Amino acid sequence: MNDIASTAAEEATLSDFRGGRPANPEFQLRGINHLALVCRDMARTVEFYQDVLGMPLVKTLELPSGMGQHFFFDIGNGDCLAFFWFPNAPEPVEGVVTAAALPGDGDITTAIGSMNHVAFDVAPEHFDEYRQKLIDKGIRVSPVMNHDDSETTVSEHLHPGVFVRSMYFRDPDGTLLELAAWTRNLGAADVSHGPATATGERVALS
């Protein structure tokens, strides 16, 4: 086995997620190829994601038979955020398709099968700078949420137990977006809760 192939094989045994956990043994997934959302106005969507957030528009499609459009934006690391525009798309419903409030401001429940929000990863050293940049662009941004393992799962202050910092805002169609910055590696102790069934019962992890 040559050096390149050997290195690739070694890397395939470890996840590149924080902490070097074992990788997926079934499928060697490389992350998100793209997430596809639906917008009301593609021109407005391009203006927001490309001109305001700086995401390059990398692919555009006109769908056949007047069905609409499908555009792709580069969000880094080879991943894309994509949007459909359908001429006769149904109107969004708060609390069903989109969260009614920003996190920390009210109810963020959305329907089963919905995409509650999209979080973009940023370096922790740029987190505060980027929050101010969004504000300077006229975007309403939530207070910073320092996620930890406390009873409320959020702290007003950054401390060693915080694992990710978050800020939330919306795109022109009300889609909930987040800039998130990991602040520490995740380990076995971070997986300590049994998943809930449909009735709310917690079951043991296998």
Label for each model-derived stretch:
Residues 31, 69, 77-79, 114-116, ...:
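Residues that flank catalytic or metal-binding motifs in active/ligand-binding sites
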Residues 63-64, 147-149, 183:
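Conserved beta-strand edge residues that scaffold enzyme active sites
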Residues 2, 42-43, 99-172, 195-206:
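Vicinal oxygen chelate
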Residues 175:
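Conserved Rossmann-like nucleotide-cofactor binding loop
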Residues 38-91:
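Core segments of cupin and vicinal oxygen chelate
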Residues 92-97, 188-192:
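A short, polar/proline- and glycine-enriched secondary-structure boundary/capping micro-motif
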Residues 2-43, 118, 122, 182-185, ...:
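N-terminal beta-strand motif that seeds the catalytic metal site of vicinal oxygen chelate
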